[in-house]
Amino acid sequence: MRIGTGYDLHRLVKGRRLVLGGVALPFEKGLDGHSDADVLVHAVCDALLGAAGLGDIGDHFPDTDARFKGVSSLLLLTETGRMLKEKGFFVVNIDATVLAQAPKLGAHKAAMAANMATALGIDAACVNVKATTTEGLDAVGRGEAMAAMSVALIIEEEARDSRGQGAG
């Protein structure tokens, strides 16, 4: 059993679309970044990569690589899942929190979780998404940025098979 954590923060800017957990949200600003800047998916990728001892998102999908310009972060998550599977790991569960002053995200959390579960090929019940504000404090609270945190639990495939545990 291995546990990893992930964190990401991106600046909010006009002229970009807002994507969280692969869901395009109506909002006057979007997250600035090389890919679609989906902070939620980026935090989840980092948690999974860290749990597997595979470095971080920047090691595998650098913002200096033109192949990742504007790419959907769900594709990065799918590739992260493939890397874990190749190393013999299985995702047991993911718990993630988005920090955003606005917009309200409650109605979109299930879709975000479902998108990430689909990208990883696991049951949606194994992915939990929460949302909170920072009560007007810091860059997130001032509406200048959004952030996300994630924790992931993975096991080796042999452990899953022998104990009958795991998602899916």
UniProtKB/Swiss-Prot annotation:
Instruction: Give the record's keywords alphabetically.
Output: Isoprene biosynthesis, Lyase, Metal-binding
GO BP annotations of the record are:
isopentenyl diphosphate biosynthetic process, methylerythritol 4-phosphate pathway; terpenoid biosynthetic process
The enzyme's E.C. designation:
4.6.1.12
Q: Which positions in this protein are listed as binding 4-CDP-2-C-methyl-D-erythritol 2-phosphate?
A: 8-10, 34-35, 56-58, 61-65, 132-135, 142
Q: What does this protein do?
A: Involved in the biosynthesis of isopentenyl diphosphate (IPP) and dimethylallyl diphosphate (DMAPP), two major building blocks of isoprenoid compounds. Catalyzes the conversion of 4-diphosphocytidyl-2-C-methyl-D-erythritol 2-phosphate (CDP-ME2P) to 2-C-methyl-D-erythritol 2,4-cyclodiphosphate (ME-CPP) with a corresponding release of cytidine 5-monophosphate (CMP).
Q: What is this protein called?
A: 2-C-methyl-D-erythritol 2,4-cyclodiphosphate synthase
Q: Please give the pathway this protein is involved in.
A: Isoprenoid biosynthesis; isopentenyl diphosphate biosynthesis via DXP pathway; isopentenyl diphosphate from 1-deoxy-D-xylulose 5-phosphate: step 4/6
Record's catalysed reaction(s): 4-CDP-2-C-methyl-D-erythritol 2-phosphate = 2-C-methyl-D-erythritol 2,4-cyclic diphosphate + CMP
Write down the required cofactor(s): a divalent metal cation
Q: Does the keyword tRNA processing apply?
A: no
User: Do you know which HAMAP family this protein is assigned to?
Assistant: IspF
Q: Where is this site: Transition state stabilizer?
A: H34, T133
Cofactor: bound how, per the entry note?
Answer: Binds 1 divalent metal cation per subunit.
User: What gene name is given for the protein in this entry?
Assistant: ispF
Task: Please state what class of enzyme this protein is.
Answer: lyase
Q: Binding of a divalent metal cation: at which residues?
A: D8, H10, H42
Q: Which SUPFAM superfamilies match?
A: IpsF-like
Superkingdom field: Bacteria
User: What Pfam families has UniProt attached to this entry?
Assistant: YgbB
What binding partners and quaternary form does the record give? Homotrimer.
The family line of this record is:
Belongs to the IspF family.
Molecular-function GO terms, alphabetical: 2-C-methyl-D-erythritol 2,4-cyclodiphosphate synthase activity; metal ion binding
